[in-house]
């Protein structure tokens, strides 16, 4: 994030625009709407702009810009002339005086940028691109305009009228936030939109009278293999309402960014033989936070019920009498194979697929080898990188062809995805050669040969 978005109160604050044409007029409208006192410095001032100056009780200085014009006390300054040299000079002089300054469409000479705005006062939504693409910002604003009802401003104003009373009655900030979230999902919203304020006030009074502190709950959420666009809608909704997010090493940073920003985030990362928090500790954390009345999102890479130890966690929750939800995620086998261009089943090559873990409880991959050498079958190994050489040797020893195709998909579905293809006889030697690191999925079977034709990334 290269810029820090803020909302600036400008009521009765004196602001300066240097420039008197249509560029200045566009910015002046926004400043006057925000309640600013508007001064203009320009040799020629558009009549419409002059009326805005009068409306705001500001001053028109009909002259060329001079450095001392900034010696007056201004909250912010906008350079809006069609002369780049003048705009740069305004910027430099404002910087010397530590004034917030914007040069219209001239990013190097800006201390702040004016975003595209969706106005549902008192609710405001802004879209900014750090000056990289104002047109894109405006297009996004147009899309958002269609999604946000005009009545949202009324709802924000209505909420403001009740805010003090709600705060006085529900003193716990987390509980208060849940109260408002539930209220905004209730029929009250439509009553406010339709100006039925008497009914809305009655509903508010009743909601406060009936309010009880919520019980804690755990959401066991599959985050998928890494690409945030592979999240389910339900996963995203629960991630954004959770008070606490307990996440592991396989949850990618872009996915974690989608969680509620003010949620407490607890890292319990797991790597082979290096668990920052052991499974028993994770189970205890889930119970502790839920018993404290928190909504807890246990965020897991892939799917929580496929080699994710989700079953163990909800057994603990069940024993403690804690309510929970389970949200499936796209498992690594599905996501990584698709992004690698390797179908796990194909009528000509594989009529079945088996998911296996190469990292067993005792630390050694002892698998039913004779069952794994059937024809027309795809094997998918999770956590099999360390024991891959042993696995390949055992498959060959139990009758599998040494030239059976194998693919390693490292960090699948992410921008760092790497795919290495080999055979049972040589794939282990390629790990060091291509610097393959966990998390890596191993796919064994004739379907791997289709990658050459079907890869799309």
From Swiss-Prot:
<comment type="function">
    <text>Then it catalyzes the NAD-dependent ring dehydrogenation of precorrin-2 to yield sirohydrochlorin. Finally, it catalyzes the ferrochelation of sirohydrochlorin to yield siroheme.</text>
</comment>
<comment type="similarity">
    <text>In the C-terminal section; belongs to the precorrin methyltransferase family.</text>
</comment>
<feature type="region of interest" description="Uroporphyrinogen-III C-methyltransferase">
    <location>
        <begin position="216"/>
        <end position="457"/>
    </location>
</feature>
<dbReference type="GO" id="GO:0019354">
    <property type="term" value="P:siroheme biosynthetic process"/>
</dbReference>
<dbReference type="Pfam" id="PF00590">
    <property type="entry name" value="TP_methylase"/>
</dbReference>
<keyword id="KW-0949">S-adenosyl-L-methionine</keyword>
<feature type="binding site">
    <location>
        <position position="225"/>
    </location>
    <ligand>
        <name>S-adenosyl-L-methionine</name>
    </ligand>
</feature>
<feature type="modified residue" description="Phosphoserine">
    <location>
        <position position="129"/>
    </location>
</feature>
<feature type="region of interest" description="Precorrin-2 dehydrogenase /sirohydrochlorin ferrochelatase">
    <location>
        <begin position="1"/>
        <end position="204"/>
    </location>
</feature>
<keyword id="KW-0511">Multifunctional enzyme</keyword>
<feature type="binding site">
    <location>
        <begin position="43"/>
        <end position="44"/>
    </location>
    <ligand>
        <name>NAD(+)</name>
    </ligand>
</feature>
<comment type="similarity">
    <text>In the N-terminal section; belongs to the precorrin-2 dehydrogenase / sirohydrochlorin ferrochelatase family.</text>
</comment>
<dbReference type="GO" id="GO:0051266">
    <property type="term" value="F:sirohydrochlorin ferrochelatase activity"/>
</dbReference>
<feature type="active site" description="Proton acceptor">
    <location>
        <position position="248"/>
    </location>
</feature>
<feature type="active site" description="Proton donor">
    <location>
        <position position="270"/>
    </location>
</feature>
<dbReference type="GO" id="GO:0009236">
    <property type="term" value="P:cobalamin biosynthetic process"/>
</dbReference>
<dbReference type="InterPro" id="IPR036291">
    <property type="entry name" value="NAD(P)-bd_dom_sf"/>
</dbReference>
<dbReference type="InterPro" id="IPR050161">
    <property type="entry name" value="Siro_Cobalamin_biosynth"/>
</dbReference>
<feature type="binding site">
    <location>
        <position position="383"/>
    </location>
    <ligand>
        <name>S-adenosyl-L-methionine</name>
    </ligand>
</feature>
<keyword id="KW-0169">Cobalamin biosynthesis</keyword>
<dbReference type="InterPro" id="IPR019478">
    <property type="entry name" value="Sirohaem_synthase_dimer_dom"/>
</dbReference>
<dbReference type="GO" id="GO:0051287">
    <property type="term" value="F:NAD binding"/>
</dbReference>
<comment type="pathway">
    <text>Cofactor biosynthesis; adenosylcobalamin biosynthesis; precorrin-2 from uroporphyrinogen III: step 1/1.</text>
</comment>
<feature type="binding site">
    <location>
        <begin position="22"/>
        <end position="23"/>
    </location>
    <ligand>
        <name>NAD(+)</name>
    </ligand>
</feature>
<keyword id="KW-0489">Methyltransferase</keyword>
<dbReference type="InterPro" id="IPR003043">
    <property type="entry name" value="Uropor_MeTrfase_CS"/>
</dbReference>
<dbReference type="InterPro" id="IPR006366">
    <property type="entry name" value="CobA/CysG_C"/>
</dbReference>
<dbReference type="GO" id="GO:0043115">
    <property type="term" value="F:precorrin-2 dehydrogenase activity"/>
</dbReference>
<dbReference type="GO" id="GO:0004851">
    <property type="term" value="F:uroporphyrin-III C-methyltransferase activity"/>
</dbReference>
<feature type="binding site">
    <location>
        <begin position="331"/>
        <end position="332"/>
    </location>
    <ligand>
        <name>S-adenosyl-L-methionine</name>
    </ligand>
</feature>
<dbReference type="InterPro" id="IPR012409">
    <property type="entry name" value="Sirohaem_synth"/>
</dbReference>
<keyword id="KW-0520">NAD</keyword>
<dbReference type="InterPro" id="IPR014777">
    <property type="entry name" value="4pyrrole_Mease_sub1"/>
</dbReference>
<dbReference type="Pfam" id="PF14824">
    <property type="entry name" value="Sirohm_synth_M"/>
</dbReference>
<feature type="binding site">
    <location>
        <position position="412"/>
    </location>
    <ligand>
        <name>S-adenosyl-L-methionine</name>
    </ligand>
</feature>
<keyword id="KW-0456">Lyase</keyword>
<feature type="binding site">
    <location>
        <begin position="301"/>
        <end position="303"/>
    </location>
    <ligand>
        <name>S-adenosyl-L-methionine</name>
    </ligand>
</feature>
<dbReference type="InterPro" id="IPR000878">
    <property type="entry name" value="4pyrrol_Mease"/>
</dbReference>
<dbReference type="InterPro" id="IPR014776">
    <property type="entry name" value="4pyrrole_Mease_sub2"/>
</dbReference>
<keyword id="KW-0560">Oxidoreductase</keyword>
<dbReference type="Pfam" id="PF13241">
    <property type="entry name" value="NAD_binding_7"/>
</dbReference>
<dbReference type="InterPro" id="IPR037115">
    <property type="entry name" value="Sirohaem_synt_dimer_dom_sf"/>
</dbReference>
């Amino acid at each position: 994030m290269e810029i820090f978005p803020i909302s600036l109160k400008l009521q009765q604050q004196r602001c300066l625009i240097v420039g008197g044409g249509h560029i200045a007029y566009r910015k002046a409208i926004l400043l006057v709407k925000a309640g600013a006192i508007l001064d203009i410095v320009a040799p020629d001032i558009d009549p419409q702009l002059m009326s805005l100056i009068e409306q705001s009780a500001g001053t028109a200085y009909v002259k060329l810009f001079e450095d001392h014009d900034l010696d007056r006390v201004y909250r912010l300054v906008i350079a809006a002339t069609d002369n780049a040299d003048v705009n740069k000079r305004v910027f430099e002089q404002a910087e010397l005086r530590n004034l917030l300054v914007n040069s219209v469409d001239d990013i190097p000479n800006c201390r702040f940028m004016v975003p595209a705005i969706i106005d549902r006062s008192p609710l405001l939504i802004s879209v900014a691109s750090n000056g990289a693409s104002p047109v894109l910002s405006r297009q996004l604003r147009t899309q958002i305009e269609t999604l946000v009802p005009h009545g949202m401003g009324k709802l924000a104003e209505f909420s403001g009228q009740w805010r003090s009373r709600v705060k006085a009655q529900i003193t716990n900030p987390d509980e208060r936030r849940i109260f408002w979230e539930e209220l905004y999902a209730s029929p009250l919203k439509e009553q406010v939109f339709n100006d039925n304020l008497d009914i809305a006030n009655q509903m508010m009074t009743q909601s406060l009278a009936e309010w009880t502190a919520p019980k804690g709950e755990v959401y066991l959420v599959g985050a998928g293999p890494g690409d945030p666009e592979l999240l389910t809608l339900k996963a995203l909704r629960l991630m954004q309402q959770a008070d606490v997010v307990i996440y592991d090493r396989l949850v990618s940073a872009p996915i974690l960014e989608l969680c509620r920003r003010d949620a407490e985030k607890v890292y319990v990362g797991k790597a082979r033989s290096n668990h920052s928090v052991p499974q028993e500790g994770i189970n205890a954390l889930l119970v502790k936070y839920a018993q404290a009345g928190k909504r807890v999102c246990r965020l897991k890479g892939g799917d929580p019920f496929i080699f994710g130890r989700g079953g163990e966690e909800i057994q603990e929750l069940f024993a403690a009498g804690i309510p929970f939800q389970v949200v499936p995620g796209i498992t690594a086998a599905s996501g990584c194979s698709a992004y690698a261009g390797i179908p796990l089943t194909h009528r000509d090559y594989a009529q079945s697929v088996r998911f296996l873990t190469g990292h067993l409880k005792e630390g050694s991959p002892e698998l039913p080898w004779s069952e794994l050498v059937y024809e027309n079958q795809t094997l998918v190994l999770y956590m099999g990188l360390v024991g891959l050489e042993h696995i390949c040797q055992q498959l060959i020893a139990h009758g599998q062809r040494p030239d059976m195709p194998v693919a390693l998909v490292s960090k699948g579905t992410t921008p760092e995805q790497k795919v290495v293809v080999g055979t049972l006889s040589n794939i282990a030697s390629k790990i060091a050669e291509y610097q393959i690191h966990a998390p890596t999925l191993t796919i064994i079977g004739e379907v791997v040969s289709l990658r050459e034709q079907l890869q799309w990334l």
